[in-house]
Design a protein with these regions (language model features):
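A sequence-level/structural motif corresponding to short, flexible coil/turn segments enriched
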Residues: 1-289
Length: 289
């Protein structure tokens, strides 16, 4: 953190490391760059710095500990499963860490490739609104409780549900709504939450989706995946409307073409989405409003 004149104010180091028992098992062969923690969004509200992150391995944030979850592959090897969370720090000195929310696969050393695919959040006063994309059976833990989230998962036939879960956290209590979609057998994680923003009584969420749109099951992606924006009532979390880009960028499975979310802006109820597509290594930028 820096002061307004540019002087360094405080530094906070956050790290992830493999669970000691897993690391010494002789069955753990991490991929390059694993374990990790990747912060994707930060906001300041009421004297606190909030951050959302995806992680593998055990994460240490001051006194906060997020445990890594691992997959047992036929008792032959252990692999990292992706978890996510939101934490806060006092903005003045980046201390007094608190875990606001943490999401991870429910079963440690289970045999299925489950996990979190994306997370984001926004704040309003003392309220925190978050949304995450996920698959499988997960445990969602917040300050005053926890709940299990069970999504359709047929590992035998490869049919997996990729859902969006939206939550409002107020005074440590969570109100959660799951937006379901039909299962499919494409393992690629094209569902993402790129940005969230509140204007008036509306919570806007932008990102990408693949196959059936969880916020509006009448919509289906075109090409590899689609940009989307959805408007929710911030009090009930009910969906009001959802729009998609509808750009046919090519087949994301065979040609590796897919839309990538970069930003979203909301002004008096008008929403603009920004993203790009990489085709034959040539970047093509497009805008939808």
């Amino acid at each position: 953190a820096y002061r307004t004149e540019g002087a360094l104010k405080a530094t906070k180091v956050i790290w992830s490391e493999a669970n000691a028992e897993i690391a010494s098992s002789g069955l753990y062969f991490p991929q390059a760059g694993f374990p990790y923690i990747k912060i994707n969004h930060i906001e300041v509200s009421n004297g606190k710095l909030y951050a959302s992150a995806m992680h593998t391995g055990d994460v240490t944030i001051g006194n906060v500990q997020w445990k890594g979850i691992y997959m047992n592959i036929f008792d032959f090897m252990y692999d990292d499963l992706i978890s996510a969370g939101i934490f806060s720090l006092d903005v003045s000195a980046l201390d007094n860490a608190e875990s606001v929310a943490q999401i991870g696969v429910k079963t440690q050393l289970g045999g299925d490739q489950m996990g979190v695919e994306g997370i984001n959040f926004t704040t309003e006063g003392n309220s925190i609104y978050l949304c995450f994309a996920a698959k499988g059976t997960l445990t969602f833990t917040y300050q005053n409780g926890s709940e299990d989230i069970t999504l359709a998962f047929d590992n035998t036939n490869g049919m997996v549900e990729h859902a969006f879960i939206t939550t409002a956290i107020q005074d440590g209590k969570a109100t959660t709504k799951i937006f379901h979609a039909d299962s499919h057998d494409n393992g690629a994680s094209y569902n993402s939450i790129g940005k969230m923003q509140i204007e008036g009584n509306t919570l806007y969420i932008g990102g990408t989706f693949h196959q059936m749109m969880p916020f509006d099951n009448k919509l289906t992606h075109v090409g590899g995946c689609d940009l989307f924006v959805t408007a929710l009532d911030k009090n009930s979390l009910e969906a009001q409307w959802t729009a998609q880009s509808g750009l046919d960028e090519g087949n994301g499975d065979t040609q590796h073409f897919n839309e990538n979310f970069t930003s979203m802006a909301v002004n008096n109820g008008e929403v603009s989405l920004y993203g790009y597509v990489l085709q034959d290594e040539n970047e093509k930028t497009f805008t939808k409003s």
